[in-house]
């Protein structure tokens, strides 16, 4: 307890965690999430929790209050994650000093990705190919 001007107050300090994982661990691993969505296209990362939650709800028609769902928004060298914990939102932010994220810049939509795709994204790899290899049928070759 500290005393200032005869008022007593306590400042509780608690590390925010999600399922026992620290916030910095969360953006490096995809564990603990039921689903992961990325916002393809461009997002204004000056937006805070309310602005990002409104993108999820109104642009993508998804529920930002669905528990254990990670929504990702990306700039070239920074990424924000939004998670509803059941009683509050948690906003995660990561900025790279060197390099950039290889983010799908297709039309503005929410893409559900796998934990493996998430790991690739965090390593700077492209997860949505611009020119995917197409299946060839033998009858088309002759």
PLM-predicted stretches and their roles:
Residues 2-142:
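Polybasic/polar functional segments that serve as interface/processing modules
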């Amino acid at each position: 307890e500290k005393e200032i001007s005869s008022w007593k107050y306590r400042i509780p300090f608690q590390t925010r965690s999600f399922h026992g994982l620290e916030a910095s661990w969360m953006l490096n691993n995809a564990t603990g999430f039921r689903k992961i969505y990325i916002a393809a296209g461009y997002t204004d990362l000056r937006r805070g929790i309310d602005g990002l939650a409104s993108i999820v709800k109104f642009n993508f028609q998804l529920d930002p209050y669905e528990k254990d769902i990670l929504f990702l928004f990306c700039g070239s060298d920074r990424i924000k994650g939004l998670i509803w914990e059941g009683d509050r939102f948690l906003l995660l932010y990561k900025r790279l000093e060197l390099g950039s994220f290889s983010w799908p810049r297709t039309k503005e939509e929410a893409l559900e990705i796998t934990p493996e795709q998430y790991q690739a994204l965090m390593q700077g790899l492209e997860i949505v190919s611009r020119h995917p290899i197409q299946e060839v049928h033998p009858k088309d070759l002759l």
